[in-house]
A protein has these predicted regions:
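Glycine-rich catalytic cores of cysteine/serine-nucleophile enzymes that process amide/ester linkages
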Residues: 34-100, 124-134
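Stable alpha-helical elements in mature extracytoplasmic
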Residues: 110-118, 136-139, 143
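Activation targets extended, charge/polar-rich intrinsically disordered C-terminal tails
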Residues: 127-185
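Structured segments of extracytoplasmic/periplasmic soluble domains
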Residues: 35, 104, 117-125, 142-150
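Hydrophobic h-region of N-terminal signal peptides that target proteins for export
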Residues: 10-21
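Sec-dependent signal peptide recognition
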Residues: 3-11
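Loop/turn positions that initiate beta-strands
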Residues: 28-32
Length: 185
């Protein structure tokens, strides 16, 4: 019975993934946005008008398309923080029809630096508080900035009780950058 349920769930997830048409020319360092299923996603969407709550950086590796991102724990055996997941797993945590790919205007050298910078942070804690870890948009913005490409239009405070009163980078701060543009759907 458990095997049957697992197979049904696996088929559903595989179907959901392959229903999404992947851009044929994805590159290292490109960004993938989603509206996630985490509690923090709902909080972010209260103030961000992009329709997204989470972002990761693509890494085209020997193992396929991977996503480097910082997130509250999505795996039962891995702590919150910067991790590398398969694109399939990243998409499986998205709400239906909420995944979009964006290309960053950057040279191949800049792309490699951005990816390497993000990879160097794998294992770092997830946090929206300065000096205590890194959150998703901060991770990708800092990696690209180290590569010489600014992809953030700024930051702002969340203005919610019990949440950091420090300015945060939101998904719309990235999407509105002149150095980021969407792949055609």
């Amino acid at each position: 019975m458990i095997v049957r349920i697992f197979n049904i769930v696996a088929l559903f997830l595989a179907g959901a993934f392959y229903a999404l048409a992947l851009p044929h020319d994805l590159k290292n360092g490109d960004l993938v946005f989603r509206d996630g299923d985490e509690v923090i996603s709902e909080i972010i969407k209260q103030v961000d008008k992009s329709g997204f709550s989470h972002v990761g950086m693509l890494w085209i590796s020997d193992y396929g398309v991977q996503v480097i991102h910082s997130t509250p724990s999505e795996h039962s055996n891995i702590k919150d923080g910067v991790t590398v997941d398969s694109l399939e797993f990243f998409i499986s945590r998205a709400k239906p029809n909420s995944v979009r790919f964006y290309q960053v205007k950057g040279s191949e050298e800049a792309r490699n630096i951005a990816v390497q910078t993000a990879l160097e942070r794998v294992g770092e804690k997830f946090s929206i508080y300065p000096g205590q870890g890194v959150y998703c948009t901060e991770l990708v913005a800092a990696a690209w900035l180290r590569a010489g490409v600014s992809i953030s239009t700024g930051s702002r405070k969340l203005d919610m009780p019990f949440i950091s009163d420090n300015p945060l980078i939101f998904p719309e701060n990235l999407i509105n950058s002149e150095n980021i543009f969407p792949y055609p759907q």
